[in-house]
From Swiss-Prot:
Signal sequence range: 1-25
Keyword Signal on entry: yes
Keyword Protease tagged: no
Stated name of the protein: Mastoparan-VT1
Keywords: Amidation, Antibiotic, Antimicrobial, Fungicide, G-protein coupled receptor impairing toxin, Immunity, Innate immunity, Repeat, Secreted, Signal, Toxin
Subcellular location: Secreted
Species of the source: Vespa tropica (Greater banded hornet)
């Protein structure tokens, strides 16, 4: 059960990250696609490392 929840949570975060990156790439046409997200372009960007750390802490 714990593994199923972790897999679903990880998939959900991955989808959020994918669509967030796509929206940012469309908004900033001059951005380098290999440079990663630009925190200045999206002040409400999801901090995936913090979410992953929280999930790891909560789930063991």
């Amino acid at each position: 059960m714990k593994n199923t929840i972790l897999i679903l949570f990880t998939a959900f975060i991955a989808l959020l990250g994918f669509f967030g990156m796509s929206a940012e790439a469309l908004a900033d046409l001059k951005a380098d696609p290999l440079a990663g997200p630009n925190p200045d372009a999206d002040p409400e960007a999801i901090n995936l490392k913090a979410i992953a750390a929280l999930a790891k802490k909560l789930l063991g």
